[in-house]
């Protein structure tokens, strides 16, 4: 099959933080997906995650993604070669990856994890305050 004709099967396991936890196990059990996708983020969620990180720097991600959703399907995902895509890392994607790696190690499951970073603007705020630019320059 050429790349042009390749079919990619994507299963949407969640649409928001707090969505039902039954989707991921059902999709994985079906064996009919190549990618399992979790969407956790919305403006309110980001605010909650930022508050959690302020209290405990290792937090700031959707903990249930690791402790509930992935723990339930991790072995099967690996066995079936399903790739997982998620934005559950919130304001601490590396913390989410570290927590997931710890669960994988605990379960004895080999796991490769990629992390996308670069959109955290909080470190820029002190410099912006010092520069005191007019609002129109920040747009």
Show the residue positions of the predicted features.
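Metallocofactor- and cofactor-centric catalytic cores in central/energy metabolism, strongly enriched
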Residues: 2-132, 137
């Amino acid at each position: 099959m050429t790349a042009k004709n390749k079919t990619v099967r994507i299963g949407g396991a969640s649409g928001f933080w707090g969505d039902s936890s039954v989707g991921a196990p059902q999709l994985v059990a079906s064996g009919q997906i190549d990618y399992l996708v979790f969407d956790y983020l919305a403006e309110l969620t980001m605010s909650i995650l930022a508050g959690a990180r302020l209290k405990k720097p290792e937090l700031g991600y959707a903990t249930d993604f690791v402790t509930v959703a992935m723990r339930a399907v991790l072995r099967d995902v690996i066995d079936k070669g399903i790739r997982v895509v998620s934005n559950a890392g919130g304001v601490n994607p590396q913390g989410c990856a570290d927590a997931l790696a710890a669960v994988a190690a605990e379960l004895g499951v080999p796991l490769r994890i990629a992390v996308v970073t670069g959109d955290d603007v909080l470190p820029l705020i002190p410099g912006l305050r010092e520069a005191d630019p007019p609002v129109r320059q920040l747009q």
